[in-house]
């Protein structure tokens, strides 16, 4: 809690906070996908040294306005940012969660962190779908919610099967 207060005070005092949204929107030229990718980079950087709740709060203060301005729904934006604040612990370059797991298993930390990243790839795609489909967040008509859930499930299954090398002989 103390670190977020200090970091927020430093960002607000320097004027970087309000400008960060402007900088992200200028780089992305208002494109939702580019804005979201820049937010993923920010989430990864913040997740390297901060606990997940603090990283999410920083993203919510400074990256969420840019994503919402680019056209994403508010609920989808915050779920997207929270998801990537969590995922930053299992993806390289730091992959703190994977490194700890490798230490417990007495395995190679780099191969464990790469495996963690590869196995979480379907989740990265689903997180981007939160920004484009409110149906995945149970918003909208029931038929669209069911169709979105089915197509997302099939997509995640297909990616997971492809990553694992299953279903090759179909």
Where would I find each of the regions flagged by the language model?
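Core transmembrane alpha-helical segments of multi-pass membrane transporters/permeases
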Residues: 1-16, 32, 36-45, 49
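Alpha-helical transmembrane segments of polytopic integral membrane proteins
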Residues: 4-7, 13, 17, 60, ...
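Membrane-interface helix termini and inter-helical loops of multi-pass transporters
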Residues: 11-27, 134-144
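Alpha-helical transmembrane segments of multi-pass membrane proteins
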Residues: 32-46, 71-87, 111-122, 136
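Hydrophobic alpha-helical segments embedded in the membrane of multi-pass proteins
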Residues: 33-41, 58-62, 76-79, 149-158
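Membrane-helix interface "capping/anchor" motifs
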Residues: 45-55, 164-170
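Hydrophobic transmembrane alpha-helices that form the pore/transport pathway of multi-pass ion
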Residues: 52-85, 94-111
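Juxtamembrane and boundary regions of transmembrane helices in multi-pass small-molecule transporters
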Residues: 83-169
């Amino acid at each position: 809690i103390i670190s977020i207060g200090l970091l927020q005070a430093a960002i607000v005092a320097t004027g970087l906070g309000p400008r960060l949204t402007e900088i992200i929107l200028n780089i992305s030229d208002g494109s939702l996908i580019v804005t979201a990718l820049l937010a993923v980079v920010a989430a990864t950087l913040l997740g390297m040294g901060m606990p997940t709740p603090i990283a999410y709060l920083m993203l919510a203060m400074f990256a969420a306005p840019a994503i919402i301005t680019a056209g994403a729904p508010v609920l989808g934006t915050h779920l997207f940012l929270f998801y990537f604040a969590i995922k930053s612990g299992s993806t390289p370059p730091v992959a703190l969660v994977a490194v700890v797991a490798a230490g417990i298993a007495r395995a190679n930390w780099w191969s464990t962190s790469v495996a963690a990243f590869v196995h979480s790839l379907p989740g990265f795609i689903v997180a981007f779908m939160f920004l484009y489909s409110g149906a995945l967040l149970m918003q909208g008509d029931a038929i669209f919610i069911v169709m979105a859930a089915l197509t997302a499930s099939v997509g995640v299954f297909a990616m997971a099967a492809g990553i694992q090398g299953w279903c090759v002989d179909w």
